């Protein structure tokens, strides 16, 4: 068996490594960026060193994937070339590739991807998988006695960088006719937070990496929106958190001023919140001279758009309704099993209290005689890659792949039929 490279090619991050391993060899941003100190765009570095080595203040960003689909093959080729040569140190001609691709991709994008793999890099064979099917495979292997494993059926909710999918999976194949999508993901959340902060305090519209870091460290899902809005309006310090901006001298990246205080509100009981609600704090205007930003209701209004897309002017259903619509599109025999096998994956599921909020909103929409069980992956960012690594270690993997010779003889469209039935 040839060397197998597993590549989870996300819109935000690339996870890559050798098949059969537990964790990927490297995780890098799927982009090129140009810091203010540089005259040219720089290849991405692994996440463990990215923020420490380079000042990303006002860095320009170029991405090959937009809204989940490949739009710049030349840029993707450049990023992959750096990945294979400098980080993975592999020879594509003697390697097989397991590559993830967003569901419902259009034929022109599929052809471009196949050309990159076989014609530009010369991989010996290729297997394309939907990320959600790999999540299902990994979770079924982790829970051999669960209903998910016994029925080989699940509903994967993938809140990724570009958008959110509710995908029914049966026997490791996605049921494409039942897939539902919300056009919201990590990128949209970051952009919304940039707009809120820029309107209320200082202009951070060019600070993509900075605001993204603040979002990941400070945002959470509200379990009682009206209560939290009242607390924020009253200037209550339990909601407020401060994010310190880099000054370029003592520190080149932002950080949370008091991490423990930022988590304090999450542990409040309902009785305590009623007491503190009556304590009105002094509301102050933003100090434009301070090198920091204060976040109050922004912390929960940003993730709230996942449940209320109408807040952004979008005519789309929220997350709970999206899940119900996806399950209702499946055969009635599958529906009770799908409600018991809901899996949350993707970086945006890391918002605190998201699972609890989803359970509360989903239960009233589900028939009383159906049980609802939601599980969150142990690592929602690496879950897809780990499923791919598991599939790559299967003895049947090579027979599932399309070889370069088959691609050259039959073309992209004919070869694709082997991946998705």
Swiss-Prot record:
Source taxonomy: Eukaryota, Viridiplantae, Streptophyta, Embryophyta, Tracheophyta
GO MF terms held by the record: structural constituent of cytoskeleton
InterPro entries (alphabetical): Actin, ATPase_NBD
Keyword Cytoplasm (UniProt): yes
Assembly mode: Component of the SWR1 chromatin-remodeling complex composed of at least ARP6/ESD1/SUF3, PIE1, SWC6, SWC2 and H2AZs (HTA8, HTA9, HTA11). Interacts directly with SWC6/SEF and PIE1. Also interacts with H2A.F/Z proteins.
GO biological-process terms attached to the record: actin filament-based process; cell division; chromatin remodeling; defense response; negative regulation of flower development; regulation of DNA-templated transcription; response to osmotic stress; response to temperature stimulus
Protein name: Actin-related protein 6
Keywords, in A-Z order: Chromatin regulator, Cytoplasm, Developmental protein, Nucleus, Plant defense
Effect annotated for changing residue 311 to V: In strain: cv. Oy-0
Places the protein is found: Nucleus; Cytoplasm
Result for mutant: residue 250 to R: In strain: cv. Ri-0
Family: Belongs to the actin family. ARP6 subfamily.
Tissue: Mostly expressed in flowers, and, to a lower extent, in seedlings, shoot apex, stems, siliques, seeds, and roots (at protein level).
One GO CC annotation: Swr1 complex
Main location class: nucleus
Role according to the record: Component of the SWR1 complex which mediates the ATP-dependent exchange of histone H2A for the H2A variant H2A.F/Z leading to transcriptional regulation of selected genes (e.g. FLC) by chromatin remodeling. Binds to the promoter region of FLC chromatin. Required for the activation of FLC and FLC/MAF genes expression to levels that inhibit flowering, through both histone H3 and H4 acetylation and methylation mechanisms. Involved in several developmental processes including organization of plant organs, leaves formation, flowering time repression, and fertility.
Effects seen without this gene: Early flowering, leaf serration, production of extra petals and weak apical dominance.
Superkingdom of source: Eukaryota
Transmembrane segments: none
Effect of mutating residue 290 to E: In strain: cv. Kil-0
């Amino acid at each position: 068996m040839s060397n197998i490279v597993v590549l989870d090619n996300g819109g935000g991050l690339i996870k890559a490594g050798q098949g059969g391993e537990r964790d990927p060899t490297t995780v890098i941003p799927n982009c090129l960026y140009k810091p203010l100190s540089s005259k040219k765009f720089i290849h991405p570095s692994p996440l463990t060193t990215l923020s420490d080595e380079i000042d990303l203040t006002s860095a320009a960003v170029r991405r090959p994937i937009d809204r989940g689909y490949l739009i710049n093959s030349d840029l993707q080729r450049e990023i992959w070339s750096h990945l294979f040569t400098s980080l993975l140190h592999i020879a594509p001609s003697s390697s097989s590739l397991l590559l993830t691709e967003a569901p419902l991709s259009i034929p022109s994008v599929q052809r471009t991807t196949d050309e990159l793999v076989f014609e530009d890099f010369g991989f010996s064979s290729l297997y394309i998988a939907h990320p959600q099917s790999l999540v299902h495979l990994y979770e079924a292997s982790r829970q051999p006695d669960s209903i998910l494993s016994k029925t080989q059926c699940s509903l994967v909710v993938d809140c990724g960088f570009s958008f959110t999918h509710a995908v029914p999976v049966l026997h490791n194949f996605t049921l494409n006719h039942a897939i539902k999508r919300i056009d919201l993901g990590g990128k949209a959340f970051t952009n919304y937070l940039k707009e809120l902060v820029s309107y209320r305090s200082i202009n951070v519209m060019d600070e993509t990496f900075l605001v993204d870091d603040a979002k990941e460290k400070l945002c959470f899902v509200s379990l009682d929106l009206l209560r939290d809005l009242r607390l924020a309006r009253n200037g209550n310090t339990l909601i407020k958190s401060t994010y310190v901006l880099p000054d370029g001298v003592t520190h080149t990246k932002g950080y949370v001023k008091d991490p423990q205080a930022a988590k304090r509100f999450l542990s409040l009981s309902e009785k305590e919140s009623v007491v503190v609600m009556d304590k009105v704090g002094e509301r102050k205007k933003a100090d434009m001279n301070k090198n920091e930003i204060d976040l109050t209701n922004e912390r929960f209004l940003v993730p709230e758009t996942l449940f209320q897309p109408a807040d952004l002017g979008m005519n789309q259903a929220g997350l709970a309704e999206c899940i119900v619509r996806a399950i209702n599109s499946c055969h009635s025999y599958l529906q009770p099993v799908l409600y018991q096998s809901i899996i949350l994956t993707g970086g945006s599921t890391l918002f605190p209290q998201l699972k609890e909020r989803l359970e509360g909103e989903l239960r009233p929409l589900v028939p009383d005689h159906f049980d609802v069980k939601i599980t969150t992956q142990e690592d929602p960012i690496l879950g897809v890659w780990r499923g791919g690594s598991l599939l790559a270690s299967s003895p049947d993997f090579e027979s599932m792949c399309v070889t370069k010779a088959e691609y050259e003889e039959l073309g992209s469209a004919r070869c694709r039929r082997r991946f998705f039935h």
